[in-house]
C-alpha cells in the first residue's frame, strides 16, 4: 500500500464517520409494504428533542422524507413516502401518513389516522388529527386544527385559530382563518347529510352539500327547486340564514 493510498483510505474513513455522526437517524432493515411501496423503520442515532438515542420511529421510504436536522420526527406506525418531507420541529405519529409532494414543517403535528397528501402543506403550530385529510394544494397553518372526518383540499387555506372538524368539507378557494369563517350543520335534508358553509377568498359564502358545491345564493335556488313545500326546504333555508348570520368578513355580512 502506497502512502497516497493510505491517505485516501484514511480520508474516506474520516469523511464517512463524520457524515454518519452528523445524521440523527438511519433506516433499519425492518420494512413494510404500504400502498405498493417499501418503507423502512427509522432509528435515532442521537438524542434530540423528546427522542432518545436508539429509539425506533415510524416508517419512511427514503432519507429525504425526514430532515436530518432539527427535531422533526416520525413515530409510532406513521408513514412518510413519495416525495413528502417532514422537517423543522414537526411530528408525524400514530397511524398518520404523509405522501405525494406534501410537506409538514414548523411545529406542526399530524397524528391519529390523519393523512396529508398531494401538494398540501401543514405548518406553524397547526395540527391535523382524527381521520382528517388535507390534500390537493391546501395549506393549513398558524394554530389551525383539522380533525374528525374533515376534508381540506383544493386551494383552501385554513389558518389562524380556525378549527375545521366533524364532517366538514372545505375546498376550492376557501379562506378560513377563524372559527366564524365556517359553519356546519347536520344531519339534515333527505339524505340526512352534513352541509358546510365557509368563506372564500372573494369574501363570499361557499356551500358544500353532498354533490352540490357552489355559492350560497345558488344553493338557496337549488333548495327551492328540489325541496319546495317540504320540511327539507324549511331546514335548509334556516341553515342558510344561520350561516349568513354566523360567517364573518363576507360581502353583505354584519
Locate each region found by the language model.
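Short, Lys/Arg-enriched N-terminal segments with co-localized hydrophobic residues
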Residues: 1-20
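Intrinsic-disorder/low-complexity loop/linker signature
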Residues: 7, 36-37, 202, 211
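Extended, small-residue-rich solenoid/repeat segments and analogous flexible loops
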Residues: 14-85, 89-91, 95, 252-253
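A structural signal for alpha-helix termini and helix-coil/disorder junctions
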Residues: 48, 225, 229, 249-253
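Thr-biased low-complexity repeat/linker tracts and other Thr-enriched repetitive architectures
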Residues: 71-175
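Mature, structured domains enriched in cysteine- and short glycine motifs
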Residues: 75, 200-202, 209-210, 244-251
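Glycine-rich hexapeptide-repeat left-handed beta-helix
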Residues: 116, 127, 133-134, 139, ...
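Charged phosphate-binding loop/patch that engages nucleotide di/tri-phosphates or the phosphate backbone
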Residues: 232-254
Amino acid at each position: 500500500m502506497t502512502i497516497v493510498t493510505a491517505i485516501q483510505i484514511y480520508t474516506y474513513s474520516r469523511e464517512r464517520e463524520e457524515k454518519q455522526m452528523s445524521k440523527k437517524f438511519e433506516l433499519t432493515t425492518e420494512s413494510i409494504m404500504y400502498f405498493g411501496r417499501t418503507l423502512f423503520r427509522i432509528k435515532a442515532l442521537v438524542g434530540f428533542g423528546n427522542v432518545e438515542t436508539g429509539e425506533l420511529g415510524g416508517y419512511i421510504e427514503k432519507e429525504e422524507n425526514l430532515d436530518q436536522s432539527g427535531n422533526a420526527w416520525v413515530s409510532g406506525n406513521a408513514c412518510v413516502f413519495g416525495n413528502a418531507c417532514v422537517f423543522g420541529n414537526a411530528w408525524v405519529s400514530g397511524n398518520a401518513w404523509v405522501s405525494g409532494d406534501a410537506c409538514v414543517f414548523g411545529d406542526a403535528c399530524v397524528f391519529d389516522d390523519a393523512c396529508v397528501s398531494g401538494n398540501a402543506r401543514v405548518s406553524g403550530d397547526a395540527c391535523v388529527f382524527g381521520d382528517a385529510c388535507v390534500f390537493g394544494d391546501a395549506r393549513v397553518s398558524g394554530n389551525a386544527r383539522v380533525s374528525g372526518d374533515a376534508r381540506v383540499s383544493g386551494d383552501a387555506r385554513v389558518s389562524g385559530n380556525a378549527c375545521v372538524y366533524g364532517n366538514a368539507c372545505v375546498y376550492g378557494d376557501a379562506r378560513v382563518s377563524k372559527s366564524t369563517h365556517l359553519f356546519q350543520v347536520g344531519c339534515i335534508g333527505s339524505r340526512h347529510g352534513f352541509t358546510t358553509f365557509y368563506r372564500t377568498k372573494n369574501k363570499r359564502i361557499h356551500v358544500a352539500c353532498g354533490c352540490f358545491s357552489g355559492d350560497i345564493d345558488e344553493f338557496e335556488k337549488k333548495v327551492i327547486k328540489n325541496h319546495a313545500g317540504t320540511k327539507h326546504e324549511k331546514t335548509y333555508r334556516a341553515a342558510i340564514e344561520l350561516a349568513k348570520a354566523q360567517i364573518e368578513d363576507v360581502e353583505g355580512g354584519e
